Amino acid sequence: MEIGQYQPNLEGDGLRIGIVQSRFNEPVCNGLADACVEELERLGVSGEDVLLVSVPGALEIPLALQKLAESGQFDALIALGAVIRGETYHFELVSNESGAGITRIGLDFNLPIANAVLTTENDEQAVARMTEKGRDAARVAVEMANLTMALDQLGDDEDEEEDEEDEEERA
């Protein structure tokens, strides 16, 4: 049996990407953003198609993502932040709530969101992971934007077939 399969597409040309970056643990978040933007450019996303906004901390990321999603101007969004256990007593709350909010926005708006909010035990772990996680967020956003657009076309193709069948029945 032969089955259809969608191949991952990392071509970023023409995609519009919104990035929300936390300023808490700023050196790590700047490292995430630098790596992310560099990778978006490498994948063909134009600088004029990227909007980067910053928020005070990880708990503010979901609201900013929601506003970007509501605008309808983006093919994918990216969340960048760093929650480090050693620096906050409410590590679990911030980690869990920001993650749940990011996921909810993506599902509510049917919009891919690459979540690169690092949750680490210490600064050293965050610094060690920031570059690769920033790059990975860019790749996830581009791949998922392309995938969701391709899957949306499946529905469009089915609608066109139904319209053609309806026209044939009326004729």
Swiss-Prot record:
Keywords: Riboflavin biosynthesis, Transferase. The keyword Transferase applies. It catalyses: (2S)-2-hydroxy-3-oxobutyl phosphate + 5-amino-6-(D-ribitylamino)uracil = 6,7-dimethyl-8-(1-D-ribityl)lumazine + phosphate + 2 H2O + H(+). Pfam families: DMRL_synthase (PF00885). InterPro entries: LS, LS/RS, LS/RS_sf. Its EC number is 2.5.1.78. SUPFAM superfamilies: Lumazine synthase. The keyword Transferase applies. Pathway: Cofactor biosynthesis; riboflavin biosynthesis; riboflavin from 2-hydroxy-3-oxobutyl phosphate and 5-amino-6-(D-ribitylamino)uracil: step 1/2. Residues 150-171 are annotated as: Disordered. One of its GO terms (molecular function) is 6,7-dimethyl-8-ribityllumazine synthase activity. It comes from the Bacteria. (2S)-2-hydroxy-3-oxobutyl phosphate binds at E87, T88, R129. GO terms for cellular component: cytosol; riboflavin synthase complex. Residues 154-171 have a biased composition (Acidic residues). One of its GO terms (biological process) is riboflavin biosynthetic process. 5-amino-6-(D-ribitylamino)uracil binds at F24, A58, L59, E60, A82, V83, I84, N115. HAMAP family: Lumazine_synth. Belongs to the DMRL synthase family. PANTHER family: 6,7-DIMETHYL-8-RIBITYLLUMAZINE SYNTHASE (PTHR21058:SF0), 6,7-DIMETHYL-8-RIBITYLLUMAZINE SYNTHASE DMRL SYNTHASE LUMAZINE SYNTHASE (PTHR21058). Catalyzes the formation of 6,7-dimethyl-8-ribityllumazine by condensation of 5-amino-6-(D-ribitylamino)uracil with 3,4-dihydroxy-2-butanone 4-phosphate. This is the penultimate step in the biosynthesis of riboflavin. This is 6,7-dimethyl-8-ribityllumazine synthase. It comes from Burkholderia ambifaria (strain ATCC BAA-244 / DSM 16087 / CCUG 44356 / LMG 19182 / AMMD).
